[in-house]
Amino acid sequence: MMCEVMPTISEAEGPPGGGGGHGSGSPSQPDADSHFEQLMVSMLEERDRLLDTLRETQETLALTQGKLHEVGHERDSLQRQLNTALPQEFAALTKELNVCREQLLEREEEIAELKAERNNTRLLLEHLECLVSRHERSLRMTVVKRQAQSPAGVSSEVEVLKALKSLFEHHKALDEKVRERLRVALERCSLLEEELGATHKELMILKEQNNQKKTLTDGVLDINHEQENTPSTSGKRSSDGSLSHEEDLAKVIELQEIISKQSREQSQMKERLASLSSHVTELEEDLDTARKDLIKSEEMNTKLQRDVREAMAQKEDMEERITTLEKRYLAAQREATSVHDLNDKLENEIANKDSMHRQTEDKNRQLQERLELAEQKLQQTLRKAETLPEVEAELAQRVAALSKAEERHGNIEERLRQMEAQLEEKNQELQRARQREKMNEEHNKRLSDTVDKLLSESNERLQLHLKERMAALEDKNSLLREVESAKKQLEETQHDKDQLVLNIEALRAELDHMRLRGASLHHGRPHLGSVPDFRFPMADGHTDSYSTSAVLRRPQKGRLAALRDEPSKVQTLNEQDWERAQQASVLANVAQAFESDADVSDGEDDRDTLLSSVDLLSPSGQADAHTLAMMLQEQLDAINKEIRLIQEEKENTEQRAEEIESRVGSGSLDNLGRFRSMSSIPPYPASSLASSSPPGSGRSTPRRIPHSPAREVDRLGVMTLLPPSREEVRDDKTTIKCETSPPSSPRALRLDRLHKGALHTVSHEDIRDIRNSTGSQDGPVSNPSSSNSSQDSLHKAPKKKGIKSSIGRLFGKKEKGRPGQTGKEALGQAGVSETDNSSQDALGLSKLGGQAEKNRKLQKKHELLEEARRQGLPFAQWDGPTVVVWLELWVGMPAWYVAACRANVKSGAIMSALSDTEIQREIGISNPLHRLKLRLAIQEIMSLTSPSAPPTSRTTLAYGDMNHEWIGNEWLPSLGLPQYRSYFMECLVDARMLDHLTKKDLRGQLKMVDSFHRNSFQCGIMCLRRLNYDRKELERKREESQSEIKDVLVWSNDRVIRWILSIGLKEYANNLIESGVHGALLALDETFDFSALALLLQIPTQNTQARAVLEREFNNLLVMGTDRRFDEDDDKSFRRAPSWRKKFRPKDIRGLAAGSAETLPANFRVTSSMSSPSMQPKKMQMDGNVSGTQRLDSATVRTYSC
């Protein structure tokens, strides 16, 4: 453009001609003038051309505006015509039309009936007229010629009466509508018919009498003739004849009177017949009026039909016109939109041209000014050039510099135009950014509202939890009050202790004597001096002389002999504690003696041994046992109270033991158990070792804090089957129940039944295991906790045994590589119990102490896993508590499965050897996905801990980072599939299970029947697989891509909705909620294009503008944020660029573990870094959940039953 406006001045036509030696400047000045004139002419022509184009564009704009105005007028007129032509109530008109059709049909039926009745009446009337005309004379002459009437006259009267009767009956049926007016006439007609019938009968009778009288009169006349002809007859005969004749005359006169009466009645009948004929005429008149009405109704019917046809034709015409008008309206709309677009474009072009025109005018002015200056300078230089040729050379240089400057000026102007265009683009982008900011603010407002709602809900739930905790605190307060009362009773029982010690020593001597007698009577056991054969410590009571069991104790050599020979060696423990231990053993024997009667009947094998032992025992031994039980019965209450209070006396020693245990760690707990049984630390007859014996009631079990997870599970009624290593029973009134949950397996029920009667058929390995676990040296005398567990059961519940005790001990046969483990768990529990009591007293039952206790327990669990990891033990060598902690923390199994596994699985070898059917039968896991979860977790931890297995890169799955709570609460909502959360949480689906879910599992167990949702789910799994199941990497990438378009692969459903809002499709954005649309679907599914997205957004096909915007922005999104690209041939199909693996290269285990160290337990994944115990609860809180609502939801989801 600038080249046309400002042509460059050629250098060949300048002053070099003057430098050729001619010496005159006159030829160069006209050339410069001509160039300037050409420049001005070209500028003027350009201006004229621009003005012409401006005028043309203005004219076209005016024309288009006029057309648009006309189109608007035409549209308004058509709309008005449409409104006037179409009825307002079309549905009402159709209903009325249907009603009119029904009425017309009814009228046609009535018309047909009236026509038929009219024909019938016409025929009947014609027949009546014929009869009347035929029999008129006979009716008139009936009375006159009654005597000589022939039988034909009767038939004519009968026919007339029949015709009238049929006529009246027909009119009865005809006149239904005028029945009220004709009711009186019909009644009268019926009366007349009856009278007519009666008269007809009387006439018949009179005819017969008349015939008889005729015969009599004929005979009388004959007699008169004879009398006249024979007058010489006697006077007697004449007198007789005269008498009979008088009688006949009287009869004739009577008959004449009767005939006169009948004639009068006949005249009355004629009058009535005349009235009936008048009535018939009236009916005919009514029939004529009905015919006229019928004709009118037919005419109206035809008119209505004609109107209906016209209305239907008008309706069809109007529909056709409406369709044409709609088409024209749509075309006009399209034309109007196109005209608006063209108008906007033309206005923009006009504004640009105006600005360009102003710029050119300014440039022209500047050029003119420069030109004038140049002319002045040129004149001066020409004047000087006449005398100074050097000045001409300088002028030539200046002219060349001026031309270069003009060229540079043209380049600068072009650059200015480019900068202006870029500025306009930036302004548009700024407007879009402001719109996005507004949308983001609206979205933030919605999010704040939802967060407020969630916070209110969480506040309500926390209030409920607070109420429950306050109730638990009240229970603790009541327990403390009971403890204070027990202390008072302890002071009272201190006085009686000396007498009780003396009595117990005497009873012990008698018991030793009875045991020696029982051993001498037994012949089936060859090893009397060897280790006693027992499995459960409660079975000690079966070895006295009254017992029916075949298990007999050896003579008590260890402690008793040492006590008699050298008391100083054995009395290293506290004298009082030792005496209490002896009391406990004696009382356990007596309690078992009382329980043996009920326990005899369980099991056939046990019954054989019991019967054989009865034959060996003497009746005197039974009597001695009975007397011994009667003697001790009175003292059991006081001894029971004293032993319960011994727990409180041991608080200080147990606190010291807990401190030692926490310093030494879990690796040296076995030695600590032995140290406690041999050193100066006294044993724990009631609380510390109670969990290693089967408790008869809850009195012997240590109390735990009520904030523990198993206690919450017990309160929810999910599973109260808690094994001894994790007993959390509140008070001595609480027993271990299974009312609210089924047993863990059928095998557990069978073992519970065997526990009552088959306590004696165990092996020497079990005896060694129990001795090691309780930390004893010399046998049953030194095991005080085994006797204490059944004391209170004599009064409270002598026959009640927990399912957990039977399962835990009979499964304990498999636990051979763990001596002292039960003692370790018991000591740990005792320490926890007493520490809990002391902390409650110090802090006043505050929540801080409960939280610290909970954190300490969690830290101890993590220390177990850290110890196993530090030692490098394979999973098969893990012990029972470590396996249970692994299930609870890393696998994320619910509390009821953890409890069942704690009761049934005692080592990692047992857990790894379980098959699918054994998992279902032994642990009670019936859900196939639950079994899949457990099997995959076992395979993963075995490969992770096996020294021969290759290192895996997916270590994050093994440590519970992406458990089922993360899947249900975070991952599924990020995919836009939160509607399946409850099914996934119920099936405990975690990240390691995602690659193993089949279509059958998705459709059946997880209820994901929509194929599009399954495709979206698979794309989400592919995204996790590409990120190597690294949760931290996923969260980091999502955080980075929150405000800019990149890494669409990791976009969540919310991020896609925000992108939809940012491109200006706000009204359709909410349609993507719960639709399954997320970034991985956009980036990985080749078949998912903008049309599928528009279908999910529910954008109508008529809205071409929104669809065009979506197509443009969708393509830009794929280009900028994904690896999908347009092919050169077809813009609609995409291809995948092979650069994804470069972005996500596989990381080594060390780097991955170091990057995800925050989600792992401390001192486990990375051995070089250690975290303090105080930081551990925070890390676990970060692992478990992200928000307060998710933390609250997890507690409710765990109550599913399998």
From Swiss-Prot:
Positions bearing Phosphothreonine: T230, T761, T1159
Location of region: Disordered: 1-33, 224-245, 426-446, 651-855, 1163-1202
Tissue expr: Ubiquitous.
Function: May regulate the disassembly of focal adhesions. May localize receptor-like tyrosine phosphatases type 2A at specific sites on the plasma membrane, possibly regulating their interaction with the extracellular environment and their association with substrates.
Keyword Coiled coil listed: yes
PROSITE patterns referenced in this protein's UniProt entry, alphabetically: SAM_DOMAIN (PS50105)
Highest taxon of source: Eukaryota
Composition-biased stretches (Polar residues): 832-841, 1184-1202
Primary location recorded for the protein, binned into one broad class: cytoplasm
Pfam families the UniProt entry points to: SAM_1, SAM_2
Description of its domains: The N-terminal coiled coil regions mediate homodimerization preferentially and heterodimerization type alpha/alpha. The C-terminal, non-coiled coil regions mediate heterodimerization type alpha/beta and interaction with PTPRD, PTPRF and PTPRS.
Residue intervals passing through the bilayer: none
Signal peptide: none
Protein name, UniProt field: Liprin-alpha-1
Family annotation (CDD domains): SAM_liprin-alpha1_2_3_4_repeat1, SAM_liprin-alpha1_2_3_4_repeat2, SAM_liprin-alpha1_2_3_4_repeat3
SUPFAM superfamilies, alphabetized: SAM/Pointed domain (SSF47769)
Subunit structure: Homodimer. Interacts with PTPRF (via D2 domain). Part of a cortical microtubule stabilization complex (CMSC) composed of KANK1, PPFIA1, PPFIBP1, ERC1/ELKS, PHLDB2/LL5beta, CLASPs, KIF21A and possibly additional interactors; within CMSCs KANK1 and PHLDB2/LL5beta seem to be the core components for recruiting microtubule-binding proteins KIF21A and CLASPs, whereas PPFIA1, PPFIBP1 and ERC1/ELKS serve as scaffolds for protein clustering.
